[in-house]
Curated annotation (Swiss-Prot):
Belongs to the bacterial ribosomal protein bL28 family. The lineage of its organism: Bacteria, Bacillati, Bacillota, Bacilli, Bacillales. This is Large ribosomal subunit protein bL28. Gene3D superfamilies: Ribosomal protein L28/L24 (2.30.170.40). Keywords: Ribonucleoprotein, Ribosomal protein. InterPro entries: Bacterial_rp_bL28 (IPR050096), Ribosomal_bL28 (IPR026569), Ribosomal_bL28/bL31-like_sf (IPR034704), Ribosomal_bL28_bact-type (IPR001383), Ribosomal_bL28_sf (IPR037147). GO terms for cellular component: ribonucleoprotein complex; ribosome. The gene is rpmB. Residues 1-23 are annotated as: Disordered. GO terms for molecular function: structural constituent of ribosome. It comes from the Bacteria. PANTHER family: 50S RIBOSOMAL PROTEIN L28, LARGE RIBOSOMAL SUBUNIT PROTEIN BL28A. Coiled coil: none annotated.
Length: 62
């Protein structure tokens, strides 16, 4: 499984990079994911969590 937020499901999104001549090539916007230890079913587990989920208090560190 690739890098994806364990809580919110956020992951990298894709789009186009545009030059001044309006040529397009593919690019990615990566989500701000942090590897943190959280409690899952009463046991600590290391998972990828988005910074937005950490700041909003949807998950607490161990």
């Amino acid at each position: 499984m690739g890098k994806q937020c364990y809580v919110t499901g956020r992951k990298a999104s894709t789009g186009n990079r545009r030059s001044h001549a309006l040529n397009s090539t593919k690019r990615r916007w990566n989500a701000n994911l942090q590897k943190v230890r959280i409690l899952v079913d009463g046991k600590p587990k290391k998972v990828w969590v988005s910074a937005r989920a950490l700041k909003s208090g949807k998950v607490t560190r161990v």
